[in-house]
Amino acid sequence: MSYTTTDADALDDQLDYQVDLVSEISVSDEESAQPTTITENFTASQNNDSAKREKRKKQRQKQKERKRAKLLELQDTNASIIQSPDTLSDLLNNYIKSIYSDLTDVELSDKVIKASYIEDTISFSKPKTVDNYPEYIQHLPGFTKKVVQNSNPEILVLCISALRAIDVLKPTKSLQNKNFKVAKLFGKHIRLEEHINYCKANKIGVGIGTTPRIAQLTNECFTCENLKYIILDYSFRDIKNNSILTSKESRKAVIDFLTSKTILENMAERKTKICFY
């Protein structure tokens, strides 16, 4: 018995076969799209995790900054209490070197502020607030509520700004009497000529103001023969957390004034001392 081999492709059963191309394409598209979707989801997840980590990092950084600011505030408030004249002298001399960096060592030596030029007020243990200014001033050795000569102040208080000077002035006015004026010495709304006339006509016990105006008055009308103390309003910090020595606007004026010929000679002769409040 013989068998005939038939090629399946050659078999014509006269039936039409239709291939579901749409279904095949859909399946194909789903299969090809699936890896992309997974990748996109994974990438999105990574981005979210990265954003969360960055947010946590920023939050930790802000917490550190807040803690640091509180610590600095605490240290600054007590700075002039816990620091000795030697330390404060070094502080001022470092600023002097920084500001007059173009001077030679010999020239800088003429501007050195010695520890003996700084009054040791460690024994005044009360907080350095504006309300305690009158008591602090009365605590200074040799303080009297009597000025001998017009235009010859006994105490000058250097402040970072006119607004701060006004704050210091308010409680300190309690020290004022006929022969001991507490004067506001800043340029805002007051002309230099007006200040000169006022100082020449009055006995200034405490002059409170900004360094530029006080320096002008020192050059124009103050004799400084009886100047006992220059108080730096050092503990106060402005809205930018600057002190009178760290603020660019006030630092150079303060150092220029403290190292001026008149003031340095007074300090060398032990007539005048610097105080940190």
UniProtKB/Swiss-Prot annotation:
Pfam families: CMS1
Entry similarity comment: Belongs to the CMS1 family.
Biased composition (Polar residues): 33-49
Organism taxonomic ancestry: Eukaryota, Fungi, Dikarya, Ascomycota, Taphrinomycotina
Gene name as annotated: cms1
Stated name of the protein: Protein cms1
Region Disordered: start-end pairs: 28-68
Main location: nucleus
Biased composition (Basic residues): 53-68
UniProt-listed InterPro entries: Cms1
Keyword Nucleus: yes
